[in-house]
């Protein structure tokens, strides 16, 4: 009786237009960054050092920048409709801007809250009572922030623009199941509104004063020369992160963007 021939399995061949043919190494894209810090720390000044910026202003932070160095900016926002108009103009109309700066998402939050309260026919006293309460108002605010982030993502991907979100800082209590509660600096936003600017950013930078202590015991005093540092690595003191391997504080010098050295998409671009 003849022994049946053993068939060798055929090696699968990739289809010329199959899904696997689309695989490639992703290219560097423009950065998406959130800058956080107390008032007067230089957030707007640093944002103005990104390549050819255009500012969307929910507040006017330009006065800290000398007039001859001020970047281009849209008129101050007076409604959320104006915000969408300005963002859509950058998406649809021809221009040569390379960075969108939104100053600030904290001020946008106030605008969003005011709109939701004003549009509620029941005339709620606060955002907590808006839209029937039970967190619905705050969820609606978070949805508007998500819309901002989505439009910014289109500019980043389609128009190859860097995106800089500016946020004011506030303290928040962190409660973890395996640690005692502790306080850190975070974004001055509702808890549900934070994710678009932290989870979905390449860099979250916290600007702080460089401080030293003098004296001993109860007589210790914090002193500072006024020098500022940009923190972009994970730390318990403040919300911060980066996807570029930065592991130390970055000194901030006037007129110099300390991130250029670390972010490929910023190098060689004016």
Question: Where on the chain are the PLM-derived regions?
Answer:
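Conserved P-loop
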Residues: 15-18, 23-102, 106-114
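N-terminal pre-Walker A segment at the start of P-loop NTPase domains
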Residues: 2-22
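A general structural signal for short secondary-structure junctions and capping/turn motifs
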Residues: 25, 45-47, 93, 154-156, ...
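Short, well-ordered beta-strand core segments
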Residues: 53-55, 163, 204-206
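Residues that form or immediately flank small-molecule/cofactor binding pockets and catalytic motifs
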Residues: 60, 78, 168, 209, ...
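P-loop NTPase motor core
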Residues: 107-193
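Conserved GTP-binding G-domain of TRAFAC-class P-loop NTPases and closely related GTPase folds
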Residues: 172-270
């Amino acid at each position: 009786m003849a022994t049946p021939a053993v068939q060798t399995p055929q090696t699968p061949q990739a289809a010329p237009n199959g899904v696997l043919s689309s695989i490639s190494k992703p290219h560097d894209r423009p950065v998406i960054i959130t800058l956080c810090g107390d008032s007067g720390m230089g957030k707007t000044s640093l944002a103005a050092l990104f390549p050819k910026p255009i500012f969307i202003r929910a507040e006017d932070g330009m006065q800290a920048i000398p007039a001859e160095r001020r970047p281009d900016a849209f008129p101050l926002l007076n409604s959320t409709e104006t915000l969408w108009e300005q963002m859509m103009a950058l998406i649809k109309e021809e221009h040569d801007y390379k960075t969108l700066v939104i100053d600030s998402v904290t001020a946008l939050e106030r605008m969003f809250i005011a709109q939701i309260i004003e549009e509620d026919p029941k005339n709620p006293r606060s955002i907590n009572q808006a839209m029937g309460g039970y967190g619905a108002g705050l969820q609606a605010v978070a949805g508007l922030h998500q819309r901002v982030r989505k439009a910014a993502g289109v500019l980043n991907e389609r128009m190859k623009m860097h995106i800089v979100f500016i946020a004011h800082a506030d303290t928040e209590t962190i409660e973890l199941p395996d640690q005692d509660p502790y306080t850190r600096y975070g974004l001055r936003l509702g808890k549900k509104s934070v994710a678009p600017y932290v989870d979905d950013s390449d860099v979250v930078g916290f600007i702080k004063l460089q401080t030293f202590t003098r004296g001993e015991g109860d007589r210790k005093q914090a002193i500072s020369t006024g020098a500022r540092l940009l923190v972009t690595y994970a730390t318990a003191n403040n919300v911060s992160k980066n996807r570029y391997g930065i592991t130390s504080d970055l000194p901030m010098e006037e007129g110099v963007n300390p991130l250029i050295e670390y972010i490929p998409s910023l190098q060689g671009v004016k």
